Amino acid sequence: MGNCTNDSYLIDGGKSNPYYDGTIMEFLQSRSPKDDPKNDYFSDLIEIIRLANMEEVLEEENVTFFAPTNWSIRKSVAMLNKMWYQMGNDSIKNLKQIKPSVWREYLSMYILKDKYTLKDIPQIDTTAIAAYPGQTFITYGGLPMNVGVVYGDANGVKYVGPRQILYSYIYDI
């Protein structure tokens, strides 16, 4: 019987600080290095924030921002281009082609006034929605959104696994 004695692949990073000492804009910029496209998650979002003239909101106001990544934004623009093509319209090739007011409206859907951490958001379980419905929050733009933490299962034990936030628009309030 043998075992692996080489554990050089193990790297103990120690405890990480869950708090970021900076503004939301600074955080987004730190995750969008110009010289490293592979690790660029938010450059499109940063451009949209600037086009919508919302930098001040994310730098100075006390808000929670559910930041869409480049992938999400590009996927949305691709879907919009498909719909526009079917209607006989030209494709969007540059984010500047969309009016700043439209960007502001859509960005506002992802911003909540006040700061919330995971412990401030109630549980949601889509298989037991009556027991764990999440909570309605009103966005920066005035829209009702249901927000809840989904507690994953681990090793067959309910609610002890990884957590993720479910964020969805409420149509009929």
Spell out what each predicted region is:
Residues 2-173:
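Mature, structured domains of secreted/extracytosolic soluble proteins
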